Amino acid sequence: MARMVTYNARSAKPHPETAHLSGIDVLALMRDQELEQIVALNDPATGLSGFVVIHDTTRGPAIGGCRLWSYPTADAALEDAIRLAVAMTRKCALAGLNAGGGKGVLIDHAGIKDRAGMLRAMGRYVESFGGRFYTSGDLGLSGADIARMRETSRYVAVPDDRKLDLAGATAWGVLGGMRATLAAAGLGRSLQGRRVVVQGLGAMGARVAALLAKEGATVIAADTDAAVAGRVASSTGARLVAADDVWDQAADLFCPCATSGVLTSETAARLRVRGVVGAANNQLDAPEVDAELMRRGVLYAPDYAVNSGAITLTAREFLERRSDLRDIAALGERVEETVTRILETSARTGNPPQQVADRLADDALVRPRSTERQFWPLR
């Protein structure tokens, strides 16, 4: 049993055993980001450590993936969870879903004693929200991992479920975003003969590369895992380049499908493309990168407008009990319409696309917030 730490609450000096936890003023952060809830997770028996962040439930229960990642600090994990939860709220609002944004983040560390047990423990945490938070897979977690979580929670969507082709739904949305971006650049809607650089060939990047090849596009791709890259190249005919060389490829589109924050001032300056459209979350390292891309004549399709396919399917299955889940190509058409609207508004107003998308999403939240706030789950 852990030893109880005692502390004089009137003292202004942090307790020496907990001083390292005081890097973030959590309540100030919650007020600044308008967060509803932050839950810290700890299961000593399995080594589970992480956070669930719920940003906003005025439109409905929070939905967001769960990721397992090697963060340098707990602060970094919490900051990532917050950014992703806020983006999920906007993604749901922009897609017209009766849902809000949340995120689960697990810290990958040497102290994980039982991976399967850790995932079942995470499922129990999700279950404890009682339908306030729905989740599925994200970076670092496989379909089998999410199935483990599903064993202990009704509120977990398994991406490999035959009814829920989550990767396919998102991939079709990415292609829809690409068509809209090509058209906005004056290149027409067709992907036939277009050159597309795909960064990251995990489950999502591989699916996008396969669809692009089927559409007749030339795929240039990279992944830090040589074996994974080789398999995708063999099945799609993609030309492989070194991971750091993706920024220097002359192409029509750049498609980030790996980790967050890949678009920095430095990488944006190296791009030789007409547009950026990808499946990765939180692609911009900083808000000003959006404006830098615009100044360079590179169209940016905001990530949460593009990668909403999986969340749309999840919301339909869990919240609306819809059975029409097979026409995932139609989700691509919806994304194409949304991205077209964003890029046309950006061209007309001179505002960067990310700012336009944020405004459209926030406007969709104004009406619910103007009435009495609803705190899910309703009783």
Language model feature labels by segment:
Residues 2-161:
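N-terminal ligand-binding/catalytic initiation module
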Residues 165-255:
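Glycine-rich phosphate/diphosphate-binding loop of Rossmann-like nucleotide-binding domains
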